[in-house]
Amino acid sequence: MPKYQFQVQVQVQPQYLPDQSAPDEGVYSFAYTITITNTGDVTAQLISRHWIISDANGHTEQVKGLGVVGQQPLLKPGEAFQYTSGCRLRTASGSMHGSYFCVAEDGEPFTCPIELFVLEAFSPGQPGQPMAARVLH
């Protein structure tokens, strides 16, 4: 039985960016705001990220890097960190999922999964109407 629990909650709010997109050229821009909350028992630092980004044609891209938006936030139990980033797809819809690699204050490494979320440029059944921002857990 572990002496403490690693637990991080990840909330995602994706948003289509019509002003930065060019659908006629196959460019669809999306922003996503992520809130990472340390719901565990121990202080932890986010070290790196790994994203798998897929479009509707099955094109998949992996993105790996240190930290998020140039930072490696240190989160005490109960603390949250929020950031906004973005990506471009060749299609009007796609998805993202991945993980964060974190290290607890005692040096113990652990991985925080990021569940799949959908990137959708247009509202279903309403072609041409940009998708409203929404929060996913």
Swiss-Prot record:
The protein's name: Protein ApaG
PROSITE patterns: APAG (PS51087)
Entries under Pfam families matching the protein: DUF525
Entry superkingdom: Bacteria
Entry's Gene Ontology BP terms: error-free translesion synthesis
Annotated ApaG domain residues: 2-126
NCBIfam families attached to this UniProt entry: PRK05461.1 (NF003967)
HAMAP family hit by this protein: ApaG
